[in-house]
Amino acid sequence: MDKTVAVKWMQDFDQKVETEKDHLSELDGPLGDGDHGANLARGMAAAIEAIKSTEPQSAAEVFKAVSMALISKVGGASGPLYGSAFMGMMKAEQAGQDLAGVLEAGLEMIKKRGHAQAGEKTMVDVWHPVVEAVKQGQLTNDVIDQAVLSTKEVAATKGRASYVGERSIGHIDPGSYSSGLLFKALLEAEE
């Protein structure tokens, strides 16, 4: 990925998170601590500052700066999960992987860090179909929206949301929603 596309992607994601931070926290209320939006907004603001201060020379360096900022600034599960994803993406980018390979490396790191699989009402439920769509050259906003909405009718079995079990049905997973924002930002950055 070109460095300028990676930077634009992260800037677009930061803007989307900032715009939707209250909604993200509302989604997190019934399932978690109600702070996903505020935490992720703080982390992405730090990530953008890190990009500016480190002046990355490659997409891999952009992903590294984002990873380190999210791990250090975002509490709860989302910081380590997103941070791990971007670290995996950095390594795949350094290895010359294409976009599908880079995103798949991010997905694998999320699965490893969170011990999660598809169908458990986690970020994996968005990352997995997005990776498959990218492999087919068919990633669209509709694919992203369908993946996010798929988490609504599933009972959470992983993470903080699993504590409410069946009562999590009817609620969109906040990490899935923010992942949807990440991939919509990717589509915009690639235009």
Regions found by a protein language model. Name each.
Residues M1-E191:
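N-terminal loops that bind phosphate or other acidic moieties
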